[in-house]
């Protein structure tokens, strides 16, 4: 039994979100939620919401027991990048890259 949840166009770079995703991959969900709640990173809040959604999907759609769930797959892919211009001195301009990512979490039973 598997349940999936996605957050598309999350406003964090994929590189920063992968640091957090690598910490919770393969963990039981209760341990992962505890780790995410104490992490100071912005991506931890985004990933925690997706994990909560995946747990709710497993409970509602599959009737799964929450205590048995494990994060079997978590992947962070790059989303589109918004390019913005920042005016600088002497008529120059810098490009500001506002990156986004797609977070996918799959939870399933241990057995």
From Swiss-Prot:
Xref: Gene3D superfamilies: Ribosomal protein L22/L17 (3.90.470.10)
A molecular function GO annotation: structural constituent of ribosome
CDD domains assigned: Ribosomal_L22 (cd00336)
Keywords tagged on the record: Ribonucleoprotein, Ribosomal protein, RNA-binding, rRNA-binding
GO biological process: translation
GO cellular component: cytosolic large ribosomal subunit
Signal peptide location: none
NCBIfam families the UniProt entry points to: rplV_bact
Family: Belongs to the universal ribosomal protein uL22 family.
Role noted for this protein: This protein binds specifically to 23S rRNA; its binding is stimulated by other ribosomal proteins, e.g. L4, L17, and L20. It is important during the early stages of 50S assembly. It makes multiple contacts with different domains of the 23S rRNA in the assembled 50S subunit and ribosome. The globular domain of the protein is located near the polypeptide exit tunnel on the outside of the subunit, while an extended beta-hairpin is found that lines the wall of the exit tunnel in the center of the 70S ribosome.
Name of the protein in its database record: Large ribosomal subunit protein uL22
The organism of origin for this protein: Psychromonas ingrahamii (strain DSM 17664 / CCUG 51855 / 37)
């Amino acid at each position: 039994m598997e349940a999936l949840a996605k957050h598309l166009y999350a406003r964090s770079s994929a590189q920063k979100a992968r640091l957090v995703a690598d910490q919770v991959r393969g963990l039981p969900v209760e341990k992962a939620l505890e780790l995410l709640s104490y992490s100071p990173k912005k991506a931890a809040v985004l990933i925690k919401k997706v994990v909560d959604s995946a747990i709710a999907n497993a409970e509602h759609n599959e009737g799964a027991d929450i205590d048995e769930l494990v994060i079997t797959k978590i992947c962070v892919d790059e989303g589109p990048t918004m390019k913005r211009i920042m005016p600088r001195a002497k008529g120059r301009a810098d490009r500001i890259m506002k990156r986004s990512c797609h977070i996918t979490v799959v939870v399933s039973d241990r057995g």
